[in-house]
C-alpha cells in the first residue's frame, strides 16, 4: 500500500491539476503516469449539460472504435434456428434460449455483451432485474436487439462500445489500453468525441461539454481542454 501511495504521489506531481490539457497531452500523461502492473484500461469521462429527465435529452448509443478496445468481449446471443447458427458462425461465445435464461438466473454471468433477436425479447425480459443494473439488457439503440446477429457479434468482438448518460449527465467509455500507441488512443478518442458531439440534443442550452477527463485504471484523472476539441 505504501508503494502504491508513493507511485500515486509521483503521478500527481507530473500532472498540473489547475491545467486543462490537449487530447494529445492528456493521452501522453495517462500513459506516462500509469503505475498499474497490468495493461490498464484508458477511459474518457464527460460531464454534459443535459437534462436526462427530458426524453429528447437522453443520450445513449453504441459505436465501433477504429482501433478497438484492446479487450476481447465474451458475447452471448439469444436466438433460435437459422439466427442461432448465424451467431455461432460469427463467433458468439454462447448461443441459446431458455437454457441460458435458467443459467443466468442461477447466478452465471461470465459474459460481457448480450444480443437478442426481436422475437426473443419476451424471454430475455425475464432477466431484467439481473441484466438491467449491469447495463447488459439488449436494446435497439445500442444495436443489440437485431435480426442481423452476425454483424452485431462481429462488431462486439471488434471494438464496439456502448455509452449512456447517467442522471447527472456523466458519460464514460473505454478508448483502449495503455499498451496502445498514443496515436491510436487519440484516434479512438476523436472518434468517440465526434459521436458525443453529434448526439447533442437540439434542445440542450449553454455549454454542452462542461468537463472532460482521461484516466487509466487506478490512475489519476487528467483534465482535457474542451475548447481544443
Curated annotation (Swiss-Prot):
In its UniProt entry, the species of origin is given as: Streptococcus pneumoniae serotype 4 (strain ATCC BAA-334 / TIGR4)
Q: PANTHER family, per this entry?
A: 54S RIBOSOMAL PROTEIN L1, MITOCHONDRIAL (PTHR36427), LARGE RIBOSOMAL SUBUNIT PROTEIN UL1M (PTHR36427:SF3)
PROSITE patterns under this entry? RIBOSOMAL_L1 (PS01199)
Q: Which UniProt keywords apply?
A: Repressor, Ribonucleoprotein, Ribosomal protein, RNA-binding, rRNA-binding, Translation regulation, tRNA-binding
Q: Which CDD domains match?
A: Ribosomal_L1 (cd00403)
Could you tell me what this protein is called?
Answer: Large ribosomal subunit protein uL1
Subunit structure, interactors included: Part of the 50S ribosomal subunit.
The record ties this protein, via Pfam families, to: Ribosomal_L1 (PF00687)
Q: Tell me which Gene Ontology terms the entry assigns under biological process.
A: regulation of translation; translation
> What is this protein for, i.e. what is its function?
Binds directly to 23S rRNA. The L1 stalk is quite mobile in the ribosome, and is involved in E site tRNA release.
What family name appears in the similarity comment?
Answer: Belongs to the universal ribosomal protein uL1 family.
The cellular component terms of Gene Ontology attached to this UniProt record, alphabetical and capped at eight, are: large ribosomal subunit
Listed GO MF terms: rRNA binding; structural constituent of ribosome; tRNA binding
Name the lineage. Bacteria, Bacillati, Bacillota, Bacilli, Lactobacillales
Cysteine pairings via disulfide bonds? none
Amino acid at each position: 500500500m505504501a508503494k502504491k501511495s508513493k507511485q500515486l504521489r509521483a503521478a500527481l506531481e507530473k500532472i498540473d491539476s489547475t491545467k486543462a490539457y490537449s487530447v494529445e497531452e492528456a493521452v501522453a500523461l495517462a500513459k506516462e503516469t500509469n503505475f498499474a502492473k497490468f495493461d490498464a484500461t484508458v477511459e474518457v469521462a464527460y460531464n454534459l449539460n443535459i437534462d436526462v429527465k427530458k426524453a429528447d435529452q437522453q443520450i445513449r448509443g453504441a459505436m465501433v472504435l477504429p482501433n478497438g478496445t484492446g479487450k476481447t468481449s465474451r458475447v452471448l446471443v439469444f436466438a433460435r434456428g437459422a439466427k442461432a447458427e448465424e451467431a455461432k458462425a460469427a463467433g458468439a461465445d454462447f448461443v441459446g434460449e431458455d437454457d441460458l435464461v435458467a443459467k443466468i438466473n442461477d447466478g452465471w454471468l461470465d459474459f460481457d455483451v448480450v444480443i437478442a433477436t426481436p422475437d426473443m425479447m419476451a424471454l430475455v425480459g425475464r432477466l431484467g432485474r439481473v441484466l438491467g443494473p449491469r447495463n447488459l439488457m439488449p436494446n435497439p439503440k445500442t444495436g443489440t436487439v437485431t435480426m442481423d446477429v452476425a454483424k452485431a457479434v462481429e462488431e462486439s468482438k471488434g471494438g464496439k462500445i456502448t455509452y449512456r448518460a447517467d442522471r447527472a449527465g456523466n458519460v464514460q467509455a473505454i478508448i483502449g489500453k495503455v499498451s496502445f500507441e498514443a496515436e491510436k488512443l487519440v484516434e479512438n478518442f476523436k472518434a468517440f468525441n465526434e459521436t458525443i458531439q453529434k448526439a447533442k440534443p437540439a434542445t440542450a442550452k449553454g455549454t454542452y461539454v462542461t468537463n472532460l477527463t482521461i484516466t487509466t485504471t487506478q490512475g489519476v484523472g487528467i483534465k482535457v481542454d474542451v475548447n481544443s476539441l
